[in-house]
Amino acid sequence: MPTGKLRQKPPYAAIMTNSPVTPSTETQQPKRDALYARFLPQEADAPPVEWLIAEGLTDYEEALAFMEARVQATREGTASELVWLVEHPPLYTAGTSANAEDLLTPDRFPVFNTGRGGEYTYHGPGQRVAYVMLDLKRRREDVRAFVASLEQWIIETLAAFNIKGERREDRVGVWVVRPEKPRLADGSMCEDKIAAIGIRLRRWVSFHGIAINVEPDLSHYGGIVPCGISEHGVTSLVDLGLPVTMGDVDVALGKAFESVFGPRQTK
């Protein structure tokens, strides 16, 4: 992995929104640990969230087109909320905060500019991507609390495998402390990113979502500076020594989702 200094990014770096949100200053914002609460529908009789798992590898452009159409339908009230679990062929995506210098090998894999928040990330086989299309008007119109809830969903999923995932206030996503690795130059403990978050809101309906590394080829991250952070690495469940399958992770994701966001409906 590349080494260097962590660039300072705004607290909303993983978010792109077309909704009327006015973030307060950093000193006024509570920490995301304090923000987390169950992100449930306000109506007791709200329909469950549709839960779909795609087979095989999903073309990225097809996924974008599907999300755009589904978000529109959700806004219009003709489609329910949806979580869509996919895997992609190897590719890089650039969020709205991406720095061109962080794309180290542009010819390695296809590169897609996307409207989600965040910087460069990698998607590929062995990584579970969950596209989250929820109507925050039915829940809470609170972007930072929503991000904290997405992080909690990941943290509870990892806990099912006895992995302690952690938040970092200056870095959206979920991190794992690696005490077995050499300490950083400043003496702090090594930390690796195991899950990324990048979302977009369109009139309070979310899309894009989260990505958890199950067993991807971690060397593929070498073509970018992941999320603009060069002093920390990336890891996966299998890299941490867990012989888990994608199916195992999907089961854990489903249970943790219901804990944080409420009922879901599978087909």
Swiss-Prot record:
Q: Where is this region: Disordered?
A: 1-30
Q: Give its E.C. classification number.
A: 2.3.1.181
Q: Record's superkingdom? A: Bacteria
Question: Where's it mainly located?
Answer: cytoplasm
GO terms, biological process: protein modification process
Q: Which residues bind substrate?
A: R116, G117, G118, E119, Y120, T121, Y122, H123, A196, I197, G198, G209, I210, A211
Entries under PROSITE patterns matching the protein: BPL_LPL_CATALYTIC (PS51733), LIPB (PS01313)
Where along the chain is composition biased (Polar residues)? 16-28
Residues annotated as domain BPL/LPL catalytic: 77-265
User: Which reaction(s) does the protein catalyse, per the Swiss-Prot or TrEMBL entry?
Assistant: octanoyl-[ACP] + L-lysyl-[protein] = N(6)-octanoyl-L-lysyl-[protein] + holo-[ACP] + H(+)
Q: Site (Lowers pKa of active site Cys): which residue positions?
A: K193
**Pathway participation:** Protein modification; protein lipoylation via endogenous pathway; protein N(6)-(lipoyl)lysine from octanoyl-[acyl-carrier-protein]: step 1/2
Q: Which stretch is the leader sequence?
A: none
Active site residues of this protein: C227
Q: Which GO terms describe its cellular component?
A: cytoplasm
Q: Which Pfam families match?
A: LplA-B_cat
Keywords carried by this UniProt record:
Acyltransferase, Cytoplasm, Transferase
As a miscellaneous remark, the entry gives: In the reaction, the free carboxyl group of octanoic acid is attached via an amide linkage to the epsilon-amino group of a specific lysine residue of lipoyl domains of lipoate-dependent enzymes.
Q: What is this protein called?
A: Octanoyltransferase
Its taxonomic placement starts with: Bacteria, Pseudomonadati, Pseudomonadota, Alphaproteobacteria, Hyphomicrobiales
